[in-house]
């Protein structure tokens, strides 16, 4: 099936034009079923060699938030602890071990064999892509998102990924946004400021 039909204006508004980065959320839980549905969308987004290096931790419990709290910057702590869900968007630097399953028509694993540092860049780049897919998938499902990078990655890695090749990238608060927490919308660069034709 060719993807030839554009989304309608309402869908584009929900995903991009009227969507906002949320700083406050309604006191409404997000079910595990919705979070599983979210991942089922995210996993279809393209990554190099279908590598899918992102790993997601959906922090919803009081114990999980308490474990996360010491890593948060002062300005992000209150809103993160109050959010129904905080997603740790991370990436597995040994993602290549799953390539024989994920990319069976070529020996893609051999492309990334060797020291872990040599594949860390690909894990970070493609895991970042998947984190962006997560934000858009959340909006598509009627959730609001508040992505941020104001935290101590080393502390998150020690608390959630100790002894593994998984590294945190950024956090995304999820829930049903409270407009009272929004700032006035900031401008964006125009096409001519940010892009060009060659």
UniProtKB/Swiss-Prot annotation:
Q: If you read the UniProt record, what top EC class would you report for this enzyme, in one word? A: oxidoreductase
- Region forming the signal peptide: none
Q: Which family does it belong to?
A: Belongs to the nitroreductase family. HadB/RutE subfamily.
Record-level Gene Ontology MF annotations: oxidoreductase activity
* UniProt cofactor(s): FMN
Work out whether the entry's keyword set contains Zinc: no
Q: What is its EC number?
A: 1.-.-.-
Q: Which InterPro entries match?
A: Nitroreductase, Nitroreductase-like, Nitroreductase_HadB/RutE, RutE-like
Q: Which Pfam family, an example, fits this chain?
A: Nitroreductase
Q: Which residues form a coiled coil?
A: none
Q: Which organism is it from?
A: Xanthomonas oryzae pv. oryzae (strain KACC10331 / KXO85)
What's the protein name? Putative NADH dehydrogenase/NAD(P)H nitroreductase XOO4267
**UniProt keyword list:** Flavoprotein, FMN, NAD, NADP, Oxidoreductase
């Amino acid at each position: 099936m060719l993807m030839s039909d554009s989304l309608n204006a309402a869908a584009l508004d929900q995903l991009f034009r009227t969507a906002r980065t949320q700083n406050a959320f309604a006191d409404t839980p997000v079910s595990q079923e919705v979070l599983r549905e979210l991942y089922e969308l995210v996993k279809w987004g393209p990554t190099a060699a279908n590598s899918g290096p992102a790993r997601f931790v959906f922090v919803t419990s009081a114990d999980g938030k308490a474990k996360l709290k010491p890593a948060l910057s002062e300005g992000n702590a209150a809103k993160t602890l109050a959010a129904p869900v905080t997603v740790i968007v991370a990436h597995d630097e040994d993602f290549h071990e799953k390539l024989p399953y994920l990319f069976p028509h070529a020996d893609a694993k051999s492309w990334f064999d060797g020291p872990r540092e040599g594949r860390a860049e690909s894990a970070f780049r493609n895991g970042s892509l998947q984190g962006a897919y997560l934000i858009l998938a959340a909006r598509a499902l009627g959730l609001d998102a508040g992505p941020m990078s104001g935290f101590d990655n080393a502390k998150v890695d020690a608390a959630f990924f100790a002894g593994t090749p998984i590294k945190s990238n950024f956090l995304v608060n999820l829930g049903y946004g409270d407009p009272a927490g929004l700032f006035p919308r900031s401008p964006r660069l125009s096409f001519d400021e940010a892009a060009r034709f060659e």
